[in-house]
Amino acid sequence: MNKTLIINAHPKVDDTSSVSIKVFNHFLESYTELIPNNETIEQINLYDDVVPMIDKTVLSAWEEQGNGQQLTDEEQKVTERMSEILQQFKSANTYVIVLPLHNFNIPSKLKDYMDNIMIARETFKYTETGSVGLLKDGRRMLVIQASGSIYTNDDWYTDVEYSHKYLKAMFNFLGIEDYQIVRAQGTAVLDPNEVLQNAYKEVKEAASRLANK
């Protein structure tokens, strides 16, 4: 059975004035109408839920786990939460990430989230010939991203749009090769309504593709 995981990386989790949230809501409305009633949709809100970052506590916990040492209560709590996030991610086979573009890159909490799911022997493994993704079982990824500028004109802005490059490369690395991005771009320089309508059309098509695959 298909399970869809929504990864909301917008700092204003349910801000209805947010362009990326508007586009996501349009997607979700179409998607839920198309999928069977028994399919599961889960959502993690990265700025509301606890998403551990790699800090002193996490590094110490990893070192102690490697040495077979007992963890402190704080270390135990944080590693258990990281495991929960990882298992939730692995249990899904369709993913939708919602984010605004922040200074040409992903929001900081999304980077923290990536550090929770990119775990050796869980989502990738090391081999003599290099790293290999372990999620090569037909999983699908849709990224919904809003930005004030336009990043597809093959100019300077295209070169420095690191969020899309990073996400696509990392999920391909994990084995998720069915990757699509829908951009609501140019909100600061184009007619905002036109930007929204174009994005609505794209996410509706994406919803149909994901629901029927």
From Swiss-Prot:
EC number annotated for this UniProt entry: 1.6.5.-, 1.7.1.17
Biological role: Quinone reductase that provides resistance to thiol-specific stress caused by electrophilic quinones.
Keyword hit for Ubl conjugation: no
Residues annotated for FMN binding in this entry: 18-20
Subunit structure and binding partners: Homodimer.
Protein name: FMN-dependent NADH:quinone oxidoreductase 1
Family: Belongs to the azoreductase type 1 family.
GO molecular function: electron transfer activity; FMN binding; oxidoreductase activity, acting on NAD(P)H as acceptor; oxidoreductase activity, acting on NAD(P)H, quinone or similar compound as acceptor
HAMAP family linked to this entry: Azoreductase_type1 (MF_01216)
UniProtKB keywords: Flavoprotein, FMN, NAD, Oxidoreductase
Cofactor: FMN
Pfam families the record matches: Flavodoxin_2
Catalysis performed (reactions): 2 a quinone + NADH + H(+) = 2 a 1,4-benzosemiquinone + NAD(+); N,N-dimethyl-1,4-phenylenediamine + anthranilate + 2 NAD(+) = 2-(4-dimethylaminophenyl)diazenylbenzoate + 2 NADH + 2 H(+)
Cofactor binding remark: Binds 1 FMN per subunit.
